């Protein structure tokens, strides 16, 4: 059966997210669409109050974020999410360094074709997949 784990993730402030450990197959790069299956070292993550989901690799002070992004993605991987309970950090794709997102179309374009840039409480924009 599937092994479901739920975590509350935070993007530096009290940003909550649920995370499901996904099937190890699918996407050729990190930060792919969870619909296609996250990689074995990623978690499928939703951020509370933010539409969509994303595959998030773990990161820490000593483990930088992987830089292999899906084709067409210009957003920068950042160690921006944190599980409030375990304090484990996760990488996400940063598409706006400030809020409000001034040019939504340009911000969305950084996320590739199936994802868009969403404002999160930490004062940044992160890419999530809408499908």
State each model region's role:
Residues 3-131:
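Secreted, cysteine-rich disulfide-bonded mini-domains of extracellular proteins
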């Amino acid at each position: 059966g599937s092994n479901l784990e739920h975590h509350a993730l935070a993007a530096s402030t009290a940003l909550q997210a649920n995370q499901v450990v996904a099937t190890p197959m699918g996407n050729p790069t990190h930060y792919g669409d969870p619909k296609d299956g996250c990689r074995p070292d990623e978690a499928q993550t939703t951020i509370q109050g933010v539409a969509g989901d994303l595959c998030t690799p773990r990161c820490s002070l000593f483990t930088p974020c992987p830089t292999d992004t899906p084709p067409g993605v210009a957003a920068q991987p950042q160690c921006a999410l944190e599980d409030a309970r375990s304090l484990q950090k996760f990488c996400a794709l940063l598409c706006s360094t400030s809020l409000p997102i001034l040019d939504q179309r340009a911000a969305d374009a950084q996320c590739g074709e199936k994802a868009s840039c969403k404002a999160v409480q930490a004062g940044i924009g992160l890419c999530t997949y809408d499908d």
